[in-house]
Amino acid sequence: MNHSRSHALFAQAQTLLPGGVNSPVRAFKSVGGEPFFVARADGPYLFDVDDNRYIDYVGSWGPMIAGHNHPAVREAVERAIGNGLSFGAPCAAEVTMAQTITRLVPSCEMVRMVNSGTEATLSAVRLARGATGRNRIIKFEGCYHGHGDSFLVKAGSGMLTLGVPTSPGVPAGLSELTATLSFNDFEGATALFDEIGAEVAAVIIEPVVGNANCIPPQAGYLQHLRTLCTRHGALLIFDEVMTGFRVALGGAQAHYGVTPDLTTFGKIIGGGMPVGAYGGRRDLMEQVAPAGPIYQAGTLSGNPVAMAAGLAMLELVQEPGFHTRLSEATSMLCEGLEDAARAAGIAVTTNQVGGMFGLFFTDDIVESYAQATACDITSFNRFFHAMLQRGVYLAPSAYEAGFMSSAHDQAVIEATLAAAREAFADVAR
């Protein structure tokens, strides 16, 4: 493939943007090489500035569950733009969005719109601290909840790509308020609560880890955390920025049958626009300003154009059979990847929950952060580039989940698997 224009743009970008990008994982630091620059997207495809086409399994990191540039979403945005870009005042679409989220996710009796997943998680933790009068939180190794200071302790996503356990600039006194657990460690969770449970405001967790690749919870693990939180008076926060409306219509909490106190959302509820939200029990949400004393605000929160895009996307995922078809397509891809790797003599396993999946270069079933980071990263990186050269774009990090969309039909998946068979053969050489 020719990448001359992308190469020139990246060289220019590096003089203007830190690392040449506006989010670290986009720089290909983990896999090596240089990123391509996208000119447009449609359905399951990205098209770069050098006119190369890629089958896309990143999906803008999750929002594009119905494929890129879906006509219903695009038309909703065009209609909204005709009425103005931002009002700085309430609009009807905000109410409709709140009605939709509270109907689809019953644990959210009230919601507050924000502009990103990071804002949502920061706001949810502030609410938990204010409501409980406690300061400590518990998170999990490899779980990423945005770039808030409290979360950059044994974080996933770009923090794993950079190979550092936390970030400079986070005060030690603040990070000391964040305790960490190993995901899927039942005994460790019980022991930590026995030690500090009376000080814990909240447990925040990705119910399916999506930022140390894709790691599902073991049977009963989320319920175990629910029980511990209830016993010790802590709140349970599900970070469903990634899993919300993707692994099931009601998110991971519906899929696993566990009810959190607070939930954070993003990605799909924006339909590709910058949107986040947090919601939960009415008695908690009524403590948020101006109804209560716990402050949170945002100039562009509830933006009418973003609400229009998100509502259109949420209409699409409510179509009968949407999530069943999405899960079946993801299973077809994962099974095909494992078969292709096996035929090449390469150890690969996959994890899948609904329309999320993970590819691990190992013989073992991956159930923890430690197992994810012990996989053969060199082989993954070679596979990534071999697939990219064949027009298939996987997440440019071994520590990121993959995302299926409803635009990935059987022909697209078969083309992906044909490329994978060749790519695995390259890796095996």
Swiss-Prot record:
Keywords: Cytoplasm, Isomerase, Porphyrin biosynthesis, Pyridoxal phosphate. It holds the Pfam family Aminotran_3. One of its GO terms (molecular function) is transaminase activity. It comes from the Bacteria. Its main location: cytoplasm. GO terms for cellular component: cytoplasm. Its EC number is 5.4.3.8. The modification N6-(pyridoxal phosphate)lysine is found at residue 267. Its cofactor is pyridoxal 5'-phosphate. It is found in: Cytoplasm. The keyword Isomerase applies. Pathway: Porphyrin-containing compound metabolism; protoporphyrin-IX biosynthesis; 5-aminolevulinate from L-glutamyl-tRNA(Glu): step 2/2. CDD domains: OAT_like. It is an enzyme of class 5 (isomerase). It catalyses: (S)-4-amino-5-oxopentanoate = 5-aminolevulinate. One of its GO terms (biological process) is protoporphyrinogen IX biosynthetic process. Belongs to the class-III pyridoxal-phosphate-dependent aminotransferase family. HemL subfamily. PANTHER family: GLUTAMATE-1-SEMIALDEHYDE 2,1-AMINOMUTASE, GLUTAMATE-1-SEMIALDEHYDE 2,1-AMINOMUTASE 1, CHLOROPLASTIC-RELATED. Homodimer. This is Glutamate-1-semialdehyde 2,1-aminomutase.
